[in-house]
Amino acid sequence: MANPFFQFKQFTVWHDKCAMKVGTDGVLLGAWASVQGAHRILDIGTGTGLVALMLAQRSLPDANIVALEIDEAAAGQAKENVARSPWKDRIEVVKQDFLFYQSPDKFDVIVSNPPYFVDSLSCPDQQRSMARHNDSLTYEKLLKGVADLLKKEGTFTIVIPTDVADRVKTAASEYHLYATRQLNVITKPGGTPKRMLITFTFNNEGCIKEELLTEVARHQYSEEYKELTREYYLHLK
């Protein structure tokens, strides 16, 4: 039986009620997205609350985080995870569809680990299907909403499959959002990137591209991945 929770250095994420469990994509997003100087942060599709909790750990002490989640069970578990954390007063979990979310104040930082496998076959489990597929929240709709909610000097960071990168960049440019940082994620030596993290801003000043190898052998993290996640993973000193 899979462990119902994942223990990090400063917080614990229970994921037994969530369709999508704690995984590398979320950890990468939470560790890599810049939160420098941010006072207002939005996490779209928070799931267990993992990314929101990771960002709370390394953001300013007065930074406030809104964690949006459409699925009722996941939102409930995210609220429980936040309530057990040191940052329960700074993270607000909101059960709502992002397509209908409105905020009177814009955000310095927006992040999202959105549904994926856009064109794959439907999953038999409805909850897992909602978490994995973006039939209702397309990349285009996501980016339009982000553009409306992001401050002029703000950043939006997303983790996506590499095969949709061109589509996402094209959609982003329609709303004057441009890639400024890009991390190609390789899971094994000699492999090709299957995941990509991209930071978008309203400034079209070129993009810094980097690569990250996560494992040098099966269940053996690379030094660069260890360095990125050292403040989170319990077993990394």
Swiss-Prot record:
Cleavable signal peptide: none
Catalytic activity: adenosine(37) in tRNA1(Val) + S-adenosyl-L-methionine = N(6)-methyladenosine(37) in tRNA1(Val) + S-adenosyl-L-homocysteine + H(+)
GO cellular component assignments: cytoplasm
This protein's record includes keyword Repressor: no
EC number: 2.1.1.223
Species this protein is from: Bacteroides thetaiotaomicron (strain ATCC 29148 / DSM 2079 / JCM 5827 / CCUG 10774 / NCTC 10582 / VPI-5482 / E50)
Compartment(s) of residence: Cytoplasm
Record keyword S-adenosyl-L-methionine present: yes
PROSITE patterns, sorted: N6_MTASE
CDD domains recorded: AdoMet_MTases
A single MF term (Gene Ontology): nucleic acid binding
Residues forming coiled coils: none
Functional description taken from the UniProt entry: Specifically methylates the adenine in position 37 of tRNA(1)(Val) (anticodon cmo5UAC).
Name under which the protein is recorded: tRNA1(Val) (adenine(37)-N6)-methyltransferase
Family membership: Belongs to the methyltransferase superfamily. tRNA (adenine-N(6)-)-methyltransferase family.
A biological-process GO annotation: tRNA processing
This protein's UniProt keywords: Cytoplasm, Methyltransferase, S-adenosyl-L-methionine, Transferase, tRNA processing
